[in-house]
């Protein structure tokens, strides 16, 4: 494994701008391969669909150094530190591909289109595609700003100690992030054409459905959030519906991994604090922090209803069932330094 990292930076007054390129290919990464029972098994030189290594096992996983991956990105950063204001602004354009990966949101058994296990051990590269954690565009910013009010500051530098106790010592901070969505896969239910233990992904044969975060009509009435603009929930016979754009994998196929992309996300966290200077060695700081300031509801492409059962349950195909972030949370804190 090797990596290539090059960059250039320029500084003007109190601001620094950086441009960087990062290339990180990966070879011989550990990957779990399910040894393809029973569809690919042989017995006495003859192919048979139901031969097991042992009557006690229906499948057998093994770890092998056969994984490969590649990560390429361009990064642009702007930093400022002056006058009580410090901030970082960063943009990343990247692409990450591999034959199996995990994201933090994935459970112990990696199913529902986010599997890191190899379906066809004789052709592991069939699963090569965008990494589960791949985000094409990402922008983030963080800042800390000490308000220029109070003794020794730009405004009110000569105010009394009592006035400074009220007006001075205030600080605002924040963290903002926006990114494009994570990839996800679709696969049918009860479909093991290649591997007895692992279902193959579906294969896109029609027009790629438009994905994002949409409010669509539901089969039981009303509306609800869905990853597809036209999932086909209320009209599964619509030839343009997302549910009709896929086919089951054939024997020997692993299907398409992470062919589709979920909705993007953004989040804002902010904090407000007040510090009282008691003497040169002691101070008291009270803080108020808010997470998900806008209380925005953003759905998780890793938890979509029946993307693993589109053939049998089209009436709920593509419905979101989990969110990426928790609702707005606030916390208060106190810190005494001595």
Predicted feature locations:
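Short, solvent-exposed micro-motifs at the edges of structured domains
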Residues: 1-338
């Amino acid at each position: 494994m090797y990596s290539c990292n090059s960059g250039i930076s320029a500084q003007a007054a109190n601001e620094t701008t950086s441009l960087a390129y990062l290339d990180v290919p990966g070879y011989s990464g550990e990957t779990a391969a399910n040894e393809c029972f029973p569809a690919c098994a042989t017995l006495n030189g003859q192919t048979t669909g139901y031969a097991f290594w042992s009557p006690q096992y229906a499948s057998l996983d093994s770890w092998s150094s056969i994984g490969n991956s590649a990560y390429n990105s361009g990064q642009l950063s702007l930093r400022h530190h002056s006058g009580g204001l410090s901030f970082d602004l960063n943009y990343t354009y990247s692409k990450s591909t591999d034959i199996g990966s995990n994201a933090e949101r994935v459970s112990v058994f990696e199913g529902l289109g986010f599997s890191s296990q190899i379906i066809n051990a004789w052709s592991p590269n069939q699963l090569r595609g965008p990494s589960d954690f791949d985000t094409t565009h990402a922008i983030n910013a963080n800042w800390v700003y000490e308000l220029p009010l109070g003794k020794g500051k730009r405004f009110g530098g000569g105010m009394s100690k009592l006035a400074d106790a009220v007006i001075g010592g205030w600080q605002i901070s924040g963290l903002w992030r926006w990114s494009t969505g994570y990839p996800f896969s679709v696969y049918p239910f009860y479909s093991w054409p290649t591997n007895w233990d692992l279902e193959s992904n579906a294969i896109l044969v029609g027009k790629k459905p438009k994905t994002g975060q949409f409010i669509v009509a539901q089969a039981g009435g009303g509306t609800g959030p869905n990853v597809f603009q036209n999932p086909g929930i209320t009209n599964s016979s619509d030839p343009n519906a997302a549910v009709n754009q896929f086919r089951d994998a054939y024997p020997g196929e692993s299907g398409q991994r992470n062919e589709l992309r979920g909705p993007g996300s953004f989040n804002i966290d902010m904090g407000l604090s007040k510090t009282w200077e008691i003497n040169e060695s002691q101070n008291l700081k009270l803080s108020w922090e808010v997470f998900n300031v806008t209380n925005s509801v953003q759905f998780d492409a890793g938890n979509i209803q029946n993307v693993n059962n589109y053939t049998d349950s089209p009436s709920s195909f593509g419905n979101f069932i989990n969110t990426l972030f928790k609702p707005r949370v606030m916390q208060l804190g106190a810190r005494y330094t001595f």
